[in-house]
Regions:
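Active-site core of glycosidic bond-cleaving carbohydrate-active enzymes
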Residues: 1-293
Length: 293
């Protein structure tokens, strides 16, 4: 099904939310802000991630060209939010919806920032025919900035432990987010092995939230471990997608422990698309329908 028109409309709205500081809100138009939950690069960064995903599937350079000025302003804004090169004490949502394991916000946010810088570099290289915008120079600047962020990440105690090779807290998401973003490129083999081990240690149960879930599935599948993803998805005990289906749910809850929250004082959404990453895994890695490069 061709959804390019609707996605393009959504992207236009997102870009229009860019303010004079370069900030892009998580809700556009920004009729209101949800208390302390309005700034996080994995949400606000849709202004970078969405046009890039659109280009990967449709090959439309015009979308990148239109989005790039906003991307530049947003990345400049994020740079001003860093402390010693990382996004510390900035992201408000982090690994939203995580269950049983915690992943540090600084790791989640900084990996997102690093990934955006590398995307910006690639966009510059794709559009570099526009010499008046000095995109060759900008590509080098984004690459240098990404390297600086990477170096800072590896020197932050909540992001990486050089003595043990552990990312973050050693959670599923800690390893997967570092792998997916490219931050763990030099330690890929060890990080993948550690990710598989922590999944097995958790009895093939899902512990990742909204950000890490897609990245856990992707990191495992790209390394040839779709069998591990399958066991997680079909796990007969909670939390798992199979348990959702066996319970009779026809929509996705916001949290893995939706039943506890539903019966308690915090009634949360039971119609939330954010945990739907299993569908992308099935399409991309089971059916094999994904971009070639």
């Amino acid at each position: 099904h061709d959804i390019c028109d609707s996605q393009l409309d959504n992207e236009q709205v997102s870009l229009a939310g860019n303010n004079e500081e370069g900030f892009v809100p998580g809700i556009v138009p920004e009729f209101y802000r949800i208390g302390g939950l309005y700034k996080d690069p994995n949400w606000n960064g849709a202004c970078v991630f969405t046009p890039w995903a659109y280009y990967q599937y449709y090959g439309d350079e015009a979308v990148l060209r239109h989005a790039f000025p906003v991307i530049e302003r947003y990345l400049a804004y994020l740079d001003r939010q860093t402390t010693n090169g990382v996004l510390e004490n900035y992201a408000q949502m982090g690994e939203w919806g995580e269950y049983g394991e915690h992943t540090p916000n600084v790791l989640v946010a900084t990996c997102a920032y690093y990934r955006m810088l590398m995307i910006a570099k690639q966009i510059c290289e794709i559009l570099k025919g526009q010499k008046e915008n000095k995109l060759d120079e900008k590509a080098k600047l984004y690459e240098a900035k990404a390297k600086a962020v990477r170096d800072a990440f590896y020197h932050h105690p909540e992001c990486y432990d050089e003595a043990t090779g552990q990312f973050g807290t050693g959670s599923q998401a800690s390893y997967a987010i570092a792998l997916f973003s490219g931050m763990a490129e030099e330690h890929e083999e060890q990080a993948v092995k550690a990710l598989v081990e922590v999944v097995k240690k958790n009895g093939y149960h899902l512990t990742s939230g909204e950000v890490g879930l897609k990245q856990v599935f992707t990191a495992l599948a790209e390394a040839g471990y779709s069998d591990v993803v399958y066991q997680m998805v079909m796990n007969p005990t909670a939390p798992s997608y199979r348990v959702f289906a066996d319970t009779g749910l026809t929509t996705l809850p916001e949290y893995w422990n939706y039943d506890e929250l539903w019966l308690g004082s915090m009634v949360r959404s039971r119609n939330h698309a954010m945990m739907g990453h299993v569908r992308e895994w099935m399409t991309s890695f089971v059916l094999g329908l994904r971009p070639q490069s």
